[in-house]
From Swiss-Prot:
InterPro entries, A to Z: GCL_type2/YbdK_subfam, GCS2, Gln_synth/guanido_kin_cat_dom, YbdK
Top-level taxon of the source organism: Bacteria
Protein name (Swiss-Prot/TrEMBL): Putative glutamate--cysteine ligase 2
HAMAP family: Glu_cys_ligase_2
Catalysis performed (reactions): L-cysteine + L-glutamate + ATP = gamma-L-glutamyl-L-cysteine + ADP + phosphate + H(+)
Organism lineage: Bacteria, Pseudomonadati, Pseudomonadota, Gammaproteobacteria, Enterobacterales
Transmembrane stretches, start-end: none
Length: 372
């Protein structure tokens, strides 16, 4: 399928996607009943969309195009009520978190969807292992060239986004010692990590044409880069965050990305070059492994800085942009989080350290989601 032309969209508009866990009490393992829930709610959603993801234990909540985080929060809140009622009617529960702490990937059923079934044929068991749960944020752009500039700019802050959203310390019944273990699941995919370097939209079109020769890429949706342009929406999509435990944190993360995008495209503070990516995977690893306690290294100067310090600097830089787009509350909340030194991964570990079980942890996450 050829790459569509870049659809011009209103700059800095938002679209947010949350991949949620569908769980089956009282054992709180993943259920395989997302299709049943989708059928139950499809005529009751008035704004946004509830849809399938890769496997039957995953449920995606997606907003429509939103002006700001307040509009997105309203849509999510309405969807949440409908989904929670349908889940209760079917004796199921819903929660966030980047991974389910003890599910077995071998039990996961891939959705009966043409694209996902084709992906299963291409990638085999890797697709079942990809039963992990992330937050994706789309930001509108006025042109393809703006999208490429924004993609490179946001890529500088991938470690910051990962550290702030880290919520996947447990996997397959084990403490992984990572704050965010979810991104590791995609490490075997040939398109894992950053997009290959291009400097403008024309070069991106050539890149996509080359990738399509592999026969594994039918559309932009088949590429699993950390950040990717979405020409059919006219957006740049950031895909590195774990799904948070609460809607409020998800909305705050979206506000952070929207404000960062506004700062990048209005001030153009960087002259991007391929060398910017020299230490990308090392810095990304630090964020996944250690969260805000990780240390990132500047590929140009060799300077090292804690992610706590680097994130506080980013929040300070984008505060004026946040005021302009109505995201100040998000930046203030994230600032409090960084100063406190807490993230959701650490809260999960604290629960287990205090004697809680992994079953109890999932139950608690369901209560958090339902009680917000």
């Amino acid at each position: 399928m050829p790459l569509p032309d870049f659809h011009v969209s209103e700059p800095f508009t938002l679209g947010i996607e949350l991949e949620m866990q569908v769980v089956n009490p009282p054992g709180y393992d993943l259920s395989q009943d997302s299709s049943m829930l989708i059928d139950a709610v499809k005529n009751k959603i008035t704004a946004g969309e509830v849809k399938h993801d890769i496997t039957e234990s995953m449920l995606e909540l997606a907003t429509d195009v939103c002006r700001d985080i307040n509009q997105a929060a309203g849509q999510f809140s309405a969807m949440q009520k409908v989904v929670l009622q349908a889940a209760a009617d079917h004796h199921l529960e819903i929660c966030g978190g980047g991974t389910h702490p003890f599910q077995k990937w071998q039990r996961q059923e891939v959705c009966d969807n043409e694209r996902y079934q084709r992906t299963l044929q291409n990638f085999g068991y890797l697709i079942q292992q990809a039963t992990v749960f992330g937050q994706h944020v789309h930001v509108g752009c006025a042109s393809g060239d703006d999208a490429i500039y924004l993609l490179h700019g946001l890529s500088r802050f991938v470690p910051h986004f990962i550290a702030l959203s880290a919520a996947s310390p447990y996997m397959q019944g084990t403490d992984t010692r990572f704050a965010s273990s979810r991104p590791n699941i995609f490490s075997a995919f040939p398109d894992n990590g950053p997009m290959p370097w291009v400097s403008n939209w024309q070069q991106f079109e050539a890149l996509f044409r080359c990738l399509s020769y592999t026969t594994m890429i039918d559309s932009i949706k088949d590429l699993h880069w950390d950040i990717r342009p979405s020409p059919h929406f006219g957006t740049v999509e950031v895909r590195v965050m774990d799904t948070p435990l609460t809607l409020s944190h998800a909305v705050n993360m979206a506000g952070l990305i929207q404000a960062t995008a506004h700062w990048l495209l209005t001030e153009r503070p960087f002259k991007h070059q391929e060398k910017d990516y020299l230490l990308y995977k090392f810095n990304r690893f630090q964020a996944c492994r250690y969260g805000l306690e990780g240390v990132i290294t500047d590929p140009h100067t060799g300077d090292r800085r804690s992610l706590t310090e680097a994130t506080l600097r980013l929040l300070e830089k984008i505060t004026p942009s946040a005021h302009k787009i109505g995201a100040s509350s998000a930046i203030e909340a994230l600032h409090r989080q960084v100063v406190s030194g807490l993230n959701e991964a650490q809260l999960m570990r604290d629960f287990v350290a205090d004697g809680g079980s992994l079953i109890g942890l999932v139950k608690k996450h369901c209560e958090i989601w339902a009680g917000e």
